[in-house]
Amino acid sequence: SSAASDVYKRQYPAFSSDPAIRKALWERQGGVCAYCERRLRNPDELDHRTRIEHFHPQHTTIWGGDCSRSSGATDQGDSTTHWHNLLLCCDGFESAGREFTCDKAKGNTDICAQFRNPTQWAPPRLLDVGRDGRATPVDGLPSDAPTVINDVLRLNERHLVAVRKQLISSFVQRINVAKRRSRGLTSNQRADLATKLRSKAAEPGQEYPSTLLSMADRLAP
């Protein structure tokens, strides 16, 4: 709605409370973590376990053109409250006590020059997910993006890779059934399956949309 769009354009101080900020970010992101794309609990729930992330970190002395572009802010002070610099993340597996990911792993590391803010990236995804469930950067990202994915955000921790691989396997099984029925897939059938995957990826609350979009692109580039 236009009212919601107006809210999204406001900066952090415009919101009356922390719950309102979380809820607006949750809605903007379709209910999934900005980095790993796990489904997030509704922030209205008492035990939501979400974290408000600053893409350009709050506590850093680094500031340059990449930081301004990534955060949408004019300076470090502005970045701490700028709407485009705010993301909502999962708890980074904090409760597990190890193999942290996302904001929990990133901390105050500045990745503005090495990666891209999900809110500032025009294509539908930052990650390409292979059949093995591992995530790599899509074309167009900086050359250091793999380091960010693997070592800073740690998006290839084994638990994330396993669940993405399981998702891929479930769809591959369905594709194989269609192949057996038709003795192979025509280009139209491949395009139809790709369209269904892309539609599913766009549904609010759909986990791991980049995995579905990667599969769709392999079916029908």
Language model: regions and residue ranges:
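Short, small-residue-biased leader/transition segments that mark boundaries at the very start
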Residues: A3-Y8
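Basic, short loop/linker segments at the boundary and entry of helix-turn-helix/winged-helix-like folds
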Residues: K9-S17
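Short, intrinsically disordered, charge-biased short linear motifs at domain edges
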Residues: S16-A24, A73-T80
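Short metal-coordination and nucleic-acid-contact micro-motifs, chiefly zinc-binding Cys/His arrays
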Residues: W26-G31, W83-L86
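Local cysteine-cluster metal-coordination motifs and their immediate loop/turn environment
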Residues: V32-R38
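Histidine-centered nuclease catalytic patch
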Residues: R38-T101
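Long, low-complexity, intrinsically disordered segments enriched in glycines and aromatic residues
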Residues: G97-L160, R164
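C-terminal, charged low-complexity interaction regions
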Residues: G140-P221
